[in-house]
From Swiss-Prot:
Residues with PTM N-acetylalanine: A2
Example of a GO cellular component annotation carried by this entry: transcription factor TFIIIC complex
Positions with biased composition (Acidic residues): 484-501, 508-520
Organism: Mus musculus (Mouse)
Pfam families linked to this entry: Tau95 (PF09734), Tau95_N (PF17682)
The family this protein is said to belong to: Belongs to the TFIIIC subunit 5 family.
Subcellular localization: Nucleus
Domain of life: Eukaryota
Protein name: General transcription factor 3C polypeptide 5
The keyword DNA-binding appears for this protein: yes
Gene Ontology BP annotations: skeletal muscle cell differentiation; transcription initiation at RNA polymerase III promoter
Length: 520
């Protein structure tokens, strides 16, 4: 705190104590604040403000009618700043019984720095239109419709058949709150006899650039033949991209992999070969074709090799495995020690703002790779830069998968008990079906049940607090055994009915669509 003396020079510097440890957040509230409690209520309360502050990508929302569930908020942008919050007190001391010039009051100013403001929220956008569900009665009185529309308690059937006035909301609300300049231009005037061109793909301008074709060949399970060689466009594309010795070495390594094993998943390739993802998109169509449906769906198969004609190809079949969760298994989705591949919270909304993250600074040794005389010597190439861990395609007992949904090939199930289930019919394979391939019917169901029990035991060892109630865990285990169809005949009948209308799981379709889009 510092006080200015009455006779001091107004331009003189005054020493002030600065509390560096006290950091504050400023909100430029678009209104006069007379009640702090009501002001915080319009911002969602202290809990909401704290939650938004912890996420730098969130915008602070202000609801002018916090009790109205349909109130459209005004959003504030977040900025970094280096400001001070000052408290200035003006004290006036009047002199009594003094006449003349000396009768002027004595004024002093007390200055105090409360803290440093490092973050500020500014409401720079425009407030959107607020549409109210209000009905005008015959006498001109406005009545709110919320009490008649909103369900605040369980209602009877008559509630849904009551007569209400027609209220049509606007067809669309604005997603942006910042104004933009729109330059109106007159309509284009064509000469007499001009006709608009026919609508076709050549005359349309897309919103984004066209995808680069990677010339992959897709094969369905019903197709009779498989391709023997890649497309000529795929060959030329790879020859143009293969410009250095590293690319040639990657090509040789991938060719050796397909010689050893004719069927590979993309994750398995990434775990065995260090290659840039963009180069892999071009190299895979040059080496193999892609199976869309059947037991080898979402896998890359060597040209000329047809797994439907080789019973020993059953070890390359794919298994869509998902970690089961729920009350009957003893843990929920939030308690699982395995993260999800995707999340809806990763998508941007109008109330969020994208900010580039600060890139950490890196230092490179310019002498690295040089010989003793300073000349360019043999450099140590980082071949493992793009390699993935083998856990993305290999299942091991006692280890949790990296994701909640995994696509394993049967040969990558490194558990003896699982391999016994796969090889139960070795030498007696007769027909290859779309669901089970060369394996016995319901082999995938038995594999999933066995793997789920292993996952349950692993989670129990890593998170024993989730299974403090042993009875619940035992019930979950019994439920797993019941789902496998070993105790009830009715369950077997239901599985037989489901087998007739077999379709690949939604998860596998989503995974294939993601990979197929890279080659369209």
């Amino acid at each position: 705190m510092a006080a200015a003396e009455p006779d001091a020079d107004p331009k003189a510097a005054i020493p002030v104590d600065l509390r560096r440890e006290r950091r504050l957040v400023c909100v430029e509230y678009p209104g006069v604040v007379r009640n702090e409690a009501k002001m915080l209520q319009t911002l969602g309360g202290e809990e909401s403000v704290s939650r938004i502050y912890t996420d730098p990508t969130k915008r602070l929302e202000l609801y002018f009618r916090p009790k109205d569930p349909y109130c459209h908020p005004v959003c504030a942008n977040r900025f970094s700043t280096s400001s001070l919050l000052l408290r200035i007190r003006k004290r006036t001391r009047r002199r009594r019984g003094v006449l003349g010039d000396e009768a002027h009051p004595q004024v002093t100013f007390n200055l105090e720095i409360i803290g440093i403001i490092s973050t500020i929220y500014k409401f720079q956008g425009m407030s959107d239109f607020q549409y109210l569900a209000v009905h005008t009665e015959a006498g001109g009185k406005h009545v709110s419709m919320y009490d008649r529309v909103l369900m605040r308690k369980p209602e009877k059937e008559e509630f849904f058949h009551q007569e209400l006035p027609l209220y049509i909301p606007p067809p669309i609300f604005s997603r942006l709150d910042t104004p933009v300049d729109y330059f109106y231009r007159p309509e284009t005037q064509h000469r007499e006899g001009y006709h608009n061109p026919t609508i076709s793909g050549e005359n349309l301008i897309g919103l984004s650039r066209a995808r680069r074709p990677h010339n992959a060949i897709f094969v369905n399970f019903e197709d009779t033949e498989v391709p023997e060689q890649p497309l000529e466009a795929a060959v030329q594309t790879w020859k143009k991209a293969c410009t250095n010795p590293i690319d040639q070495k990657v090509e040789e390594e991938l060719r050796k992999l397909f010689d050893i094993r004719p069927v590979w998943s993309r994750n398995a390739v990434k775990s065995n070969v260090s290659v840039h993802p963009d180069k892999l998109k071009i190299l895979l169509p040059y080496m193999a074709y892609y199976m869309i449906t059947g037991p080898w769906r979402s896998l890359w198969i060597r040209f000329g090799y047809d797994p439907r004609k080789h019973p020993d190809a059953k070890i390359y079949q794919v298994l869509d495995f998902r970690i089961r969760c729920g009350m009957k298994y003893g843990y929920g989705s939030r308690d699982m020690p395995v993260k999800a591949k995707r999340s809806t919270y990763n998508y941007s909304l109008p109330i969020t703002v994208k900010k580039t993250s600060n890139q950490p600074g890196t230092m490179h040794d310019l002498k690295q790779g040089l010989g003793p005389s300073g000349t360019d010597g043999p450099r140590k190439l980082t071949y493992n830069k793009y390699k993935l861990k083998d856990s993305v395609y290999i299942f091991r007992e006692g280890a949790l998968p990296p994701y909640r949904q995994m696509f394993y090939q049967l040969c990558d199930l490194n558990v003896e008990e699982l391999q016994k289930i796969v090889h139960r019919n070795d030498g007696t394979e007769t027909v290859c079906t779309e669901r089970d391939g060369w394996c016995l019917p319901k082999t995938t169901d038995h594999l999933r049940d066995t793997m789920s029990l292993m996952i349950l035991q692993t989670i129990r060892s890593e998170r024993p607090a989730l299974f403090s109630n042993t009875g619940k865990a035992d019930r979950g285990k019994e439920q797993l055994m019941f789902e496998s169809g070993e105790e009830e005949e009715e369950e077997e009948e239901e599985e037989e009915e489901e087998e007739e209308d077999f379709k690949p799981s939604d998860g596998s379709e989503n995974e294939m669509e993601t990979e197929i889009l890279d080659y369209v």
